[in-house]
Structures are given as structure tokens and as C-alpha cells.
């Protein structure tokens, strides 16, 4: 028997490429995104009461890892990609039905939009369902996992003055807190800042929305998040 499911919305994420995404949610608290709900879930009725919740579970599709033939064994990155395990013993993206789940922080609730942080989702990810995180039920005090018994190791990031300047410029261009993202990322997601080829600028819209506050989703798209109008650039001076 087969079942058909349809997305209730899509995530607009700061992660545009799958190879830069943290392996688990909450590893990069500064990673932000917006879940844009589709009709009929975009009227506000479906999210009424959700403002009382701090975190939510997102059930989603690994839309860039869907396969016709299911894999019985996978090579999880945590084991260096050299050891295979049964797919059900891992959180690998290659799932029998392409389903994933992440618990993320709910920053703000609006009709048709949920503002999120601590995400590990690719831009455009289809979301199948939303469920509130319930601490007394979702926390299992005596749970254990011998495969992943500790968080991934962190690598200290030492910023030179030039790297800080570049991070600031890229942060303004991308409307993302680059320094915080790099500092909170897991080893797989760390990247060396590169020289900017354009002057730093902030993206603003005629509707008055400013997107370079470090708390809003990226403006690396052709329209404003609020009113869907094309953005304009406003030059800013770098801050050390």
C-alpha cells in the first residue's frame, strides 16, 4: 500500500548548499530561516497557540537525496565514511522514504510564517508536518547511544583583523551573522573567509524592512521577505 503526502510549506534557509549544513540541529544556533506555509495552512488558524512554544519538531523531506532504490546500509559521516551501518541505526540523509526530522527554536510566529533558528535545513526544504516540542515527553533522562555518545568536537576559531573585516563585509552582503555561524559550526561546516569582491552593503526595502540585523533570514534573493518587492542596496562602512 502506498500513501501520498504533500508539503505544508518550504524552508527559506541560510544554507544554500547541502555540503555546508550542520549534521544536527542546534549545532549552529545562529543559523536562521523562515518556514513559509502553503495554503490552506497560511491563514494563521493552523499556528494559533504555537506562540506559547519555544521549540518545534519539523518533519521534512531530504529533497536532494531522494532515491528510487532504498539503501539498506549507509556510511555515516560520524564514522569517517569508512564504516557502513544499517540505515535505521543512523541519521543519514538517505532514508527509505526520504523523511527527516529536526528540533529547532521557534523565534517568532506569524500567519503563514514561522521564524526559526538553530536549523540544519537546506534552502527550499519541503516540510511535511510541524509538532511542538514537549520537554517532559521528549527528554529521556536515561537514554544512551553508543554510536554517538558525545557531541562532535569543536575547533577553536582565531580571527585575524583581516578575517574579521571580510566576515563583516560578507555578513552585510548575505545578511547573516557570518562570525557567529563560523564560530558555532561543527568541524564539517567551517570555512575560511574569502576576500569580498564588492563593497559592503546592506539590503533594504521600500517597505522599511531592514534585513541586516543578524536575526533575520538571508536577503540573497530577488525580493523582500516582507512585501516581495525587489530590494535596494544602502552602502555601509565596515565596523571593526
From Swiss-Prot:
EC number(s) reported in the record: 2.1.1.-
Transmembrane domains' residue ranges: none
Gene3D superfamilies: YaeB-like
Top-rank EC class of the record's enzyme: transferase
Amino-acid positions noted as binding S-adenosyl-L-methionine in the UniProt annotation, renumbered to this chain: 22-24, 63-64, 91, 122-125
Keyword Methyltransferase belongs to the record: yes
GO molecular function, one term: tRNA (L-threonylcarbamoyladenosine(37)-C2) methyltransferase activity
Keyword Coiled coil: no
GO biological process: methylation
Alphabetical UniProt keywords: Methyltransferase, S-adenosyl-L-methionine, Transferase
NCBIfam families xref list: tRNA_TsaA
Family: Belongs to the tRNA methyltransferase O family.
Official protein name in the record: Putative S-adenosylmethionine-dependent methyltransferase RcsF
Organism this protein belongs to: Pseudomonas aeruginosa
Gene: rcsF
